[in-house]
């Protein structure tokens, strides 16, 4: 859903460089990969769904990936190497673990199993690059919330509890377009005043 909207925006604006900000609900590794292939910089925070973190154990982010050797270094300084590869939901996933886990003094802070297994998508580097961009632009999320959330809150308030009065996608699109047009006109009148529009 993210990449088609981003590509359409890029075409509409007629620009070569485009940075797309979206909230966690739009996170999809495959969509972020499609954006990068279309030379669109996506900034979509990764959802925090790790059971380890909520249980107070080490998260995947605590393991450092060494691309040259294709292995992870754990918080104890041991290495988890690639053991197998599988296809999950159409994505190639590599699995890593270490033989040092059963004797590790940090095991209880890492896993409840005999060893910690780490999954890595074949295009995980795309997601990691995006995360570095997000880390380098902490104001981006704040800017998105200021510009987008207020607008949607206002539109939802105007539209009321039923939201759309029409049915079928073409009619709903038309209704939404009219709502957005009304919002934009109101903003222009607040900023410029009514006189320049007459």
Map each language-model feature to its residues.
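Anion-binding and metal-coordination hotspots
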Residues: 1-198
